[in-house]
């Protein structure tokens, strides 16, 4: 009933083994590792928000479609998605027959709108970007073991340079910038 960002829940939160209710009716929950086994069809699911970080390819996220969902929106870059969309940049390309949509990365969602405005108004011959990112679930709160030793350090105590696929993704959502951005 408490969230570190949003504070106390308004109203009463109730739950059972496979559902919770935050005041507007039961919401089905599952703990299934394989999306193909989630009973989307039985629950009339229209759109799955794939936010696990585990199913970031069209093939993997399409398991939700096989389980009965009509559409999948992946909240990350998604290899071979039907379409990569940044709202306000290229969302006009969405069609009813687009089944697996990638919402790109948080960095792409910040860079693409600015790049679009610049490209449309004055043009872009070449661009270079850097990113400062909040620490993620992949970085430990305390020093710990990690396959990448730089990420083994306490996240709040370290600035860790890392790579980004945002420059490539900007070319996906703004084809006129393909190959023009680096960083």
Residue map of PLM features:
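Charged docking surfaces used in two-component/phosphorelay signaling
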Residues: 138-183
